[in-house]
Amino acid sequence: MENRLINPVERVDDSVDNNIRPSTLAEYIGQPVVREQMEVFIEAARRRNEALDHTLIFGPPGLGKTTLANIIAREMGGNLRSTSGPVLERAGDLAAMLTNLEEGDVLFIDEIHRLSPVIEEILYPAMEDFQLDIMIGEGPAARSIKLDLPPFTLVAATTRAGLLTSPLRDRFGIVQRLEFYNIEDLTTIVSRSARLMNVVMTPEGAVEVARRSRGTPRIANRLLRRVRDYAQVKSNGEVTGEIADSALDMLAVDRRGLDHLDRRYIEMVHARFDNGPAGVEAIAAAMAEDRGTLEDVIEPYLIQQGYVLRTARGRVLTQMAIDQL
């Protein structure tokens, strides 16, 4: 799974994308509703000289949650302190981060759904009252003291918003869902990335990469790097529509953005479960994958594109998926 080219989960080689990420809302492409709302919220907070309300960003991986957190920090003029749910194992880890924040800073917690209940309890007063409750001592002599924190903004990201507890979710004043990108916006993103990477690319080449990127900018930039390699070796370095088509065919990413794992999922439900309904645990066992991989990585795009229906009785293939077979 880790080496799957169109896996939207971040890989080590995706770190080069940091150089081409937009740094302001004006440069941010796509997500028009989110962009317009954040422009208003950020400008209003700046005019009042206040910290932005705590913000929760959720959606499938690879759509720009971390990028948006960076943009929020830059637009608000504060420093960005980043961590993730699995990293914050002890109460002291979070307390250290909170006490090092300065007024107007942005604390970004990725995968916030993986926070432990103990860490969540510390976050509640920090988010609500900008206070940190610390226990000093042990046993009968233990006492609690409150530390005042400077006004800050917590920006949290998750691919599993449904796993957040209600008390935590209710403390976010702003909640934004990122949607899959359309081909037009992805084409603009690919063209911009190509320009920043000094890749000569025709409009047709950008469209070909965009249409196979599964609505995900991270995948689009990853495919662009591989298509660039192909163009340099097999041609004169220019990425045309024909070159992009040949490169992506070689990489086994078809024109619908499906790869061998997607096709295997569809074929498995068709052959083993008679087109469904089939339980996700049964499909995962048949494919030798875990349930989380199916729900977070494979199914979102298949459902969004209309290949699979998620029903109370299980997963069902649509006629579109059957026709592909």
From Swiss-Prot:
Q: What is its EC number?
A: 3.6.4.-
* SUPFAM superfamilies (UniProt xref): P-loop containing nucleoside triphosphate hydrolases, Winged helix' DNA-binding domain
Q: What class of enzyme is it?
A: hydrolase
One GO cellular component term: cytoplasm
What is the role of this chain?
The RuvA-RuvB-RuvC complex processes Holliday junction (HJ) DNA during genetic recombination and DNA repair, while the RuvA-RuvB complex plays an important role in the rescue of blocked DNA replication forks via replication fork reversal (RFR). RuvA specifically binds to HJ cruciform DNA, conferring on it an open structure. The RuvB hexamer acts as an ATP-dependent pump, pulling dsDNA into and through the RuvAB complex. RuvB forms 2 homohexamers on either side of HJ DNA bound by 1 or 2 RuvA tetramers; 4 subunits per hexamer contact DNA at a time.
**NCBIfam families, per this entry?**
PRK00080.1, ruvB
Q: Which protein family is it in?
A: Belongs to the RuvB family.
What's the protein here called? Holliday junction branch migration complex subunit RuvB
Its lineage reads: Bacteria, Pseudomonadati, Pseudomonadota, Gammaproteobacteria, Moraxellales
